[in-house]
């Protein structure tokens, strides 16, 4: 029986999950909820189901796999990763995975706070000023390894790919000074299942955020 992934009809927090589902060749339904337009941003399509799905903490995204009903995007990623041994194999690798999962979410939230802010035009230059230092830390952490935990793909590569790609859309030159990050992005996009997915009609790269965001390329 296929899994069900529920989320808004945007990229948002589901992008890394969708990528991981595709990479692992998992059968799933990508259930997309539509939000209304301004000024109300009607959410009734989701709210009408929110408390009927048996979720402990009803929220989007959610993943339903038989009796397993999971919310929180990183909990979903970890669940899928455990099924496919993509959590790191050594203690050192798992430590790197744990660190990077949290670091990537911090970076994601920092960008989102700028993009959802009514003061976006004021905050954007400030954010761009600090961006090279952020990218430098990711570059140094990756080093000469092909993947962020080491020699094998783990679920945080999906998370970091998404976060770096969002920043690449936000500021197209932000990775230019970091060849290893650019190589990582190309290596990830070159994975057969990922490449096939990105060429398919199922692939959703934009919009990144919900409709109330002040920066949200279509």
UniProtKB/Swiss-Prot annotation:
Any one Gene Ontology BP term: hepoxilin biosynthetic process
Protein's gene: Gstm2
Protein name: Glutathione S-transferase Mu 2
Keyword Transport: no
Phosphoserine modification, residue list: 27, 44, 117
Organism of provenance: Mus musculus (Mouse)
Described function: Conjugation of reduced glutathione to a wide number of exogenous and endogenous hydrophobic electrophiles. Participates in the formation of novel hepoxilin regioisomers.
Assembly mode: Homodimer.
Gene Ontology MF annotations: glutathione transferase activity; identical protein binding
GST C-terminal domain segment(s): 90-208
Cellular localization per UniProt: Cytoplasm
Gene3D superfamilies membership: 1.20.1050.10, Glutaredoxin (3.40.30.10)
The protein's Enzyme Commission number: 2.5.1.18
Binding site for glutathione: 7-8, 43-46, 50, 59-60, 72-73
Stated family: Belongs to the GST superfamily. Mu family.
Cellular component, GO annotation: cytosol; mitochondrion
One protein family per Pfam: GST_N
Residue ranges of domain GST N-terminal in the record: 2-88
Alphabetized UniProt keyword annotations: Cytoplasm, Lipid metabolism, Phosphoprotein, Transferase
Record-listed substrate binding positions: 116
Catalytic activity reported: RX + glutathione = an S-substituted glutathione + a halide anion + H(+); 11(S)-hydroxy-14(S),15(S)-epoxy-(5Z,8Z,12E)-eicosatrienoate + glutathione = (11S,15S)-dihydroxy-14(R)-S-glutathionyl-(5Z,8Z,12E)-eicosatrienoate
